[in-house]
């Protein structure tokens, strides 16, 4: 790993603000420009929050509780649009600065639990059973419907640099080329099913968390993937660091049951990847994410703890505030705020400490 380490006291967080939604927080995400936090709930609420310099959250309601879960959120690359999908089978898109609903795409009552904006253009991909549709914001039309065929879609992820769309499900991952949607997708086969998928920040690796308790890392353009085994259950969550080690490779964190493993590329190709475990959580880890530009890893679990791991190795701090457990988390794009959602409707935000003082709802290790 890179020897240039950040001072620990600069990485600790202090309680910043809290708000409450009426039910389980299903997703939380920041706009790419860092000005807005979006959150949604199992009651169907969709809200925007401006994080003020003072300790408060200013919530703007885009959608009130409907009784049907809102499950996924994504901001467009220019931060102008927010998309949400959920149990009612609709994909709704709002203009962020005005809160205006600009599109309401009916998905024929198929639960929409995965959606993502392209980081390269104003295209929105979303799941609809065994299919993925790609909606073009410029023309307000569904550009293409892709047939995964072998099962319902379990995850989808755009390549960060080029117009590739990876889609996972039974028997692996299919990668479509957005320059020509009619071209047959590339297929990355697994004997079981692939759930969570994640491209590394530069797009050279695709991580695949599988239902047979394995993790596969594909180096794009190399047809010999690395297979990691020994997980206690299915690999539920993946997170790449945008900081790289001395080999120029990012770290990959993988959550399975109550444990987290961190994988680092080894200089010896025959070894492939080294790993180590992070074990503090007592219940299922629901979300993991690296702070931008560092190896500081945050993990949120059903045990009511958000843990911060220094250099993705050493427990640095435990954040609390959701007694029924944490369901999701997201770092601000510049890393100075961490937002997390709770199973009881809590929305908590922590901010970087000034000299490591005033920690609010936290424990220092």
List where the protein language model places each region.
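Residue-level detector of Asp-centered blade-edge/turn motifs that repeat once per structural unit
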Residues: 32-33, 77-78, 119-120, 160-161, ...
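Short coil/turn segments within WD40 beta-propeller repeats
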Residues: 43-47, 88-92, 110, 130-133, ...
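WD40/WD-repeat beta-propeller blade N-cap
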Residues: 18-25, 62-70, 106-112, 147-153, ...
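Short loop/turn segments that connect beta-strands within beta-propeller blades
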Residues: 51-54, 96-99, 137-140, 178-181, ...
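A short beta-strand motif characteristic of beta-propeller blades
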Residues: 14-18, 57-63, 100-105, 141-146, ...
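A short helix->beta-strand "capping" segment at the edge of beta-propeller domains
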Residues: 2-23, 57
């Amino acid at each position: 790993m890179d020897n240039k380490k950040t001072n620990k006291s600069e990485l600790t967080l202090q309680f910043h603000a809290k708000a409450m939604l009426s039910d389980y927080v299903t997703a939380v995400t920041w706009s790419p420009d860092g000005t807005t936090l979006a959150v949604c709930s199992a009651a169907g609420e969709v809200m925007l929050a401006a994080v003020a310099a003072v300790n408060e959250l200013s919530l703007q309601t885009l959608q009130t509780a409907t009784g049907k879960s809102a499950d996924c959120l994504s901001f467009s690359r220019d931060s102008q649009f927010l998309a949400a999908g959920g149990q009612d089978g609709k994909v709704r898109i709002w203009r962020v600065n005005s809160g205006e609903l600009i599109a309401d795409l009916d998905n024929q009552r198929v639960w929409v639990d995965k959606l993502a904006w392209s980081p390269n253009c104003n295209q929105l991909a979303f799941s609809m059973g065994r299919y993925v549709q790609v909606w073009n914001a410029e023309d307000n039309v569904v550009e293409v419907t892709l047939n995964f065929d072998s099962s319902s879609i379990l995850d989808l992820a755009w390549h960060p640099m080029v117009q590739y769309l990876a889609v996972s499900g039974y028997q692996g991952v299919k990668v479509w080329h957005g320059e020509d949607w009619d071209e047959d997708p590339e297929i990355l086969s697994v004997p079981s099913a692939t759930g969570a998928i994640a491209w590394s920040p530069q797009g050279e690796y695709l991580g695949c968390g599988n239902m047979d308790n394995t993790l596969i890392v594909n180096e794009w353009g190399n047809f010999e993937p690395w297979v990691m085994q020994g997980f206690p259950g299915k690999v539920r969550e993946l997170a790449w660091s945008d900081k790289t080690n001395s080999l120029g490779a990012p770290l990959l964190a993988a959550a399975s049951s109550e444990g987290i493993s961190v994988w680092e590329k080894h200089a010896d190709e025959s070894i492939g990847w080294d790993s180590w475990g992070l074990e503090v959580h007592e219940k299922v880890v629901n979300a993991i994410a690296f702070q931008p530009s560092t190896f500081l890893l945050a993990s949120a679990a059903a045990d009511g703890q958000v843990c911060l791991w220094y250099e993705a190795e050493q427990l640095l701090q435990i954040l609390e505030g959701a007694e029924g457990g944490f369901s999701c988390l997201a770092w601000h794009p510049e890393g100075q705020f961490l937002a997390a959602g709770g199973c009881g409707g809590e929305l908590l935000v922590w901010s970087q400490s000034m000299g490591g003082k005033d920690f609010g709802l936290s424990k220092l290790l």
